[in-house]
Amino acid sequence: MTETKGATVRVAVEDGIAMVTVDNPPVNAISQAIRQGLIDAMAEINGNPEVAAAIIIGAGRYFMAGADVREFDKPALPPSLPEAISSIESSEKPVVAAIHGVALGGGLEVALGCHYRIVDPGAKLGLPEVALGIIPGSGGTQRLPRLIGFAKALDLISSGRQAGAGEAAEMGLVDAVAEGELAAAAMDFIRQRIGAAPPRLSAIDPPAPESQDFFETARARLARRARGQESIVRALDALEAATLPFDQGAKREREIFNELRGSDQAKALRHAFFVKPREVASIGVVGGGTMGAGIAVASLRAGYQVTMVEASSDALTRGLGNVEKNL
């Protein structure tokens, strides 16, 4: 075995198979270092004649839980995630994503850029970007419908929900569910595909929508459901761009992503994602009747300082009495 040490991405070669391990605790967020590490790893793999295929896997509990959201409010640092994914997809040697834990957002987009996908039975996959006021911006809206069709792709992207391993296999999102240890299963899987031309989703002709009025009907339905949330409706705009040649559709997707990233809605949702609730030290209770006294008693028992407010001193005295009776 040979191994190249890196800060966040490691490459180990054994019996002609390169194991590319993404290691960025706690959730393997796809930071600038991860993006650069993936590009460097693919260059090393394709330049090594002893390597016939590669596996991309995550260290710890997850494959990759998405982009590093903390970077969204800062100037973009190269390389971009689309560039990193392109370096994987363009590999002349087959690459399989070995997914455990979760592959979410950019993590699933990385997996879609791999030629194959194998998952642990407990894995979850999804594109939850709409919950942050954005859309998948690294080819997810372009590759996913080419793999599973527009209807299923729209369901996953517009809802942001996660699909389990069984559902992912049934819809064609993954190629196999691992039996036994994931890394070993991925090794067996990719060995059987050495020498075959790696399938690339970006090379597939644009798919036809399920019906002639698919986008029109979906847009009306999503507008009602979105209730003003821009990202849900704009996700459909990006998906519709998948009817174009891949490069054109990917360019449109990135334009929409960048427009949404700087929007007030996205900024507010990112704030809500990171904000921590303020610590509560004291509680005010208005009214000392049965309900107010009950709230006061529960709060006191939980260790909070309680201030009771009533309309008169007599009512306050009765309220305090109600509290004392229940303590």
List each language-model region with its residue ranges.
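Conserved CoA-thioester-binding segment of acyl-CoA-metabolizing enzymes
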Residues: 1-59, 83-86
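Amphipathic alpha-helical segments at domain termini/boundaries
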Residues: 1-22, 65, 109, 113, ...
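An acidic, glycine-rich surface segment that forms the CoA-thioester-binding/catalytic face
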Residues: 39, 69-101, 140-142, 147, ...
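Glycine- (often His-adjacent) and acidic-residue-rich active-site loop
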Residues: 57-87, 103, 131-134, 314
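Glycine-rich beta-to-alpha active-site loop
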Residues: 87-132, 136, 164, 287-290, ...
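Gly/Pro- and small hydrophobic-enriched strand-loop and loop-to-helix capping segments
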Residues: 115-137, 174-187, 309-313
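NAD(P)+-binding Rossmann beta1-loop-alpha1 motif at the extreme N-terminus of oxidoreductases
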Residues: 275-326
